[in-house]
Amino acid sequence: MLRVFVLLIFNVNAYCMYLNWTSHDRPNIVMIMSDAFDGRLTFQPGNKVVQLPYINYMRELGSVFLNSYTNSPICCPSRAAMWSGQFVHLTQSWNNNKCLHPNATTWMDDLRKSGYHTHSMGKLDYTSGHHSVSNRVEAWTRDVPFLLRQEGRPVTDLVGDASTKRVMIKDWTITDAAVQWIRNTTASLTQPFALYLGLNLPHPYRTDSLGPTAGGSTFRTSPYWLNKVSYNQVSVPKWLRFKDMHPVDYYSTVTKNCSGHFTEEEIRNIRAFYYAMCAETDGMLGEVMAALRDTGSLNKTVVLFTSDHGDLAMEHRQFYKMSMFEGSSHVPLLIMGPGVKSGFEVSLPVSLVDIYPTVLDLAGVPQTGGLSGHSLIPLISRVSIHSAEPHPAWAFSEYHGCNANTSTYMLRIAEWKYIAYADGLNVPPQLFNLSKDESELRNIASQFPDVCQDLDKLLRSIVDYPSVSKSVHRYNKQQFLEWKQSLGDSYSQVIASLRWHVDWKKDAKSYERDIDEWLLGLD
């Protein structure tokens, strides 16, 4: 027993040496996780379009990761990966309804066990059983051969006036609570604290006019925040013609209700409103930073800012997430605090599963086995560190939810982004050279078959994606069949009332037949 205790103390001290801390002087840890924040806005030239003073402050005094990715571009699976430190296919977090068990171990649990005073506030969204029935059914039926609009058409909504700072009241309320907790609780603590604050912004708001099942397609802000946006810097992204789109991207464009006509003014306004919502998010980050500063905790606290995914904001003729394009999959990741390099940029691809081992290193807690990620501390520490398990040169993401009609797998390495689908045979892959094609408009997979072959081999060493795709396909059918049987005679009425109801009612019987034929192949 004594030997185990001595080894534990040795390990804690060894980890704390990474950042010149002792086991008795561990840092506080504060993580702010937004929702749908485009990571490209956190570094030049992306942040020229909108004023983000507190993100810029973190970048100047800390380290920013230039190629940080979600492990699944949708809310719940992404957060499940971040909290568990495991890839989505390992936890089988297939969609917004199927994620972690409520009792799953998270890095916050490990911090609490190691002596931290822990507190989580706001949006968590990493356990199973949540989100709307419509969202679940759309995910389960994504490979049924019909094409229905599932989202409201993206729109803008300007509220208040030039003095209206608080638009997303729910987020401001929880931010106020976090600020009060810092001001009123932390001073009396005898141990370090770990605070998690989850925000909803800049996720678009639900479009109430579309009914209770509607998704988030309203970009809402006030003149106060819109004034933070340089409107003349807001670009109108180029779109491929429908016939030139990848089949999965075309499906996404239609189901997201973006296949109709949009004027340049509409597109620019949607993007400007989205950037304004990012500015409001930055304002909440600033409130937390001010509370840490005013209580004398800032110089003893490591602060992390990230997001579960981004938002396409009309790039590739889409909004929302659910895509491996940069606007959707590229997330912010900034870390500042004692021992962290200042004004430092990390170009190595990383992802949200890296947060778990990173937080353990920050706290001087020995690493947990079975994690998919790697600690980022050796990359940003002011002290030169030799890592026994250096971070790989790639980042990996996967998607199995709604608004994409097959499972999607993305590998990001060097200048390449490789995207594979389904079993790797029936849907063609995509390959982009991001150093030459930042807008991802030129799929060069057919021009570089050797690169695709090499990257596909690497991808298969990470995940047996044909087998995973088959498992998800089987799960979707089983879940839908159970849901259908539970409804009995009300099935036709209920399925017709979901978010696709506008298109569904045009030929309800035909769509029901499509589903019945799909179910006949139940594995």
Curated annotation (Swiss-Prot):
It comes from the Eukaryota. The conversion to 3-oxoalanine (also known as C-formylglycine, FGly), of a serine or cysteine residue in prokaryotes and of a cysteine residue in eukaryotes, is critical for catalytic activity. Its cofactor is Ca(2+). SUPFAM superfamilies: Alkaline phosphatase-like. The keyword Acetylation does not apply. Its EC number is 3.1.6.1, 3.1.6.18. The modification 3-oxoalanine (Cys) is found at residue 75. It is an enzyme of class 3 (hydrolase). It is found in: Secreted; Lysosome. GO terms for cellular component: extracellular region; lysosome. Keywords: Calcium, Glycoprotein, Hydrolase, Lysosome, Metal-binding, Secreted, Signal. Substrate binds at residues 123, 246. Coiled coil: none annotated. One of its GO terms (molecular function) is arylsulfatase activity. Glycans are attached at residues 103, 257, 405. Binds 1 Ca(2+) ion per subunit. Ca(2+) binds at residues 35, 75, 308-309. Residues 1-16 form the signal peptide. It catalyses: an aryl sulfate + H2O = a phenol + sulfate + H(+); Hydrolysis of the 2-sulfate groups of the 2-O-sulfo-D-glucuronate residues of chondroitin sulfate, heparin and heparitin sulfate. The active site is at residue 75. Belongs to the sulfatase family. Catalyzes the hydrolysis of pseudosubstrates such as p-nitrocatechol sulfate and p-nitrophenyl sulfate. Catalyzes the hydrolysis of the 2-sulfate groups of the 2-O-sulfo-D-glucuronate residues of chondroitin sulfate, heparin and heparitin sulfate. Acts selectively on 2-sulfoglucuronate and lacks activity against 2-sulfoiduronate. This is Arylsulfatase K.
